[in-house]
Amino acid sequence: MMNRNLLRAAAAMAVTLFTFLAQPAAAAEPVPPAQLPRLIDSGTFPTGHIQGIAVDTEHRYIYYSYTTMLVKADMQGRVVGTVTGLVGHLGSLTFNAEDGRVYGSLEYKNDAIGRGILAASGHEGEINEGFYVVIFDVDRITRTDMSAERDGVMTAVFIGDILRDYTATVRTEQGERQHRFGCSGFDGITFGPRFGRTGGHRYLTLSYGIYDDTTRTDNDYQVLLQYDTRRWRRYEAPLSQSAMHRNGPEHPDGRYFVFTGNTAYGVQNLCYDDATKRWYMAVYYGQKPQYPNYTLFAVDAASRPVKSALRGVPYVGRENVLPLSDTGVEDKATGIRGWHFPYGSTGLCAIGDVYFYISHHYVENKRQGSRIRLYRWTGSAEHPFEQVR
């Protein structure tokens, strides 16, 4: 007969093993930014150029927007899955750690850029114009060529204010013009605190695209919208590109302006960095000679908006104006501060502890690619970022 003590010991071991196996798996810990790969090569794709990046350091995935396609890859650059079939312009991306999803800007319009995308996609005729925040359920992206419309991986929320500004005709100081504030749509997208605060709830923040018309004065501000997305599930719906819905909030929770001088197509990439408590705006070079035409600007999160009239904009009253950060190079003629930094307009992502991933776009055999490099913020006037090697 088996010794009773041995039986008791075996039973205790079985209970311990069952209890251990029944425990939920521990969540993966985010990788310290300094230990992340110094370089991630996205590979090349037969699409438009890379528009933005988003990083999930906990689950160790990186996401790229290639104009009409979303790419999910691991941190070595190996592609896990793609979402295709878009005939609009998929711009910047941001990862929301609160719900584990990737948010992006999506534009449908019949201007030169929109027509080019439609032609490249084989779409005949025009399309209903509209602007959407698209939300990707990235856990479901498990293979390449998943359909944005049919595979249940993407929902969309309509942003009515941007469409209204895009389609508006206004009376400027130079006469009647289309596109209020020069609005060409929107590109930059990120989560951060309400302007004027460094903590609290995170608001989805969108930045306008702005046409680079040098003959008007109402397009010299960056325009930023903030939304509280905690109740956005009621608006989310799949997007049929043949019959696009109009589900979305009536207005943003805040509209803000930053005077930078005109930049071609506004803010290309927008990100908020918790370590420095700043918003960063990466832009294309502007064409107006009276401005310094920096390619990187910053706004301190603690800077409170001030109700002010907008210079060169006669058709609105006093608006919420945010000052630029007092870091960077100051242009003595205008007081505008910023940096001449050559990268960031195709991807700028804060990942913690003053580290950033920044896209270096390239073309190879007529295909578009990006080498995404790890940088550390220095704050210096001449070299705001240093590459980590």
What would you call each of these model-derived segments?
Residues 117-143, 217-236, 240, 292-314, ...:
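Beta-propeller blade signature
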Residues 68, 107-110, 139, 168, ...:
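Residue-level signature of beta-propeller blades and closely related beta-rich strand-turn architectures
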Residues 76-126:
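Blade-loop segments of beta-propeller domains
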Residues 56-86, 249, 304-311:
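Beta-propeller domains
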Residues 37-42, 139-186, 229-264, 308-342:
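Surface-exposed loop and turn segments in beta-propeller and other repeat-based domains
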Residues 47-54, 87-96, 165, 182-192, ...:
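Repeated scaffold domains used in trafficking and secretory/extracellular systems
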Residues 55-58, 95-99, 193-200, 274-276, ...:
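Residue-level detector of Asp-centered blade-edge/turn motifs that repeat once per structural unit
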Residues 38-68, 187, 193-194:
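Beta-strand-rich domains and repeat architectures in extracellular enzymes and scaffolds
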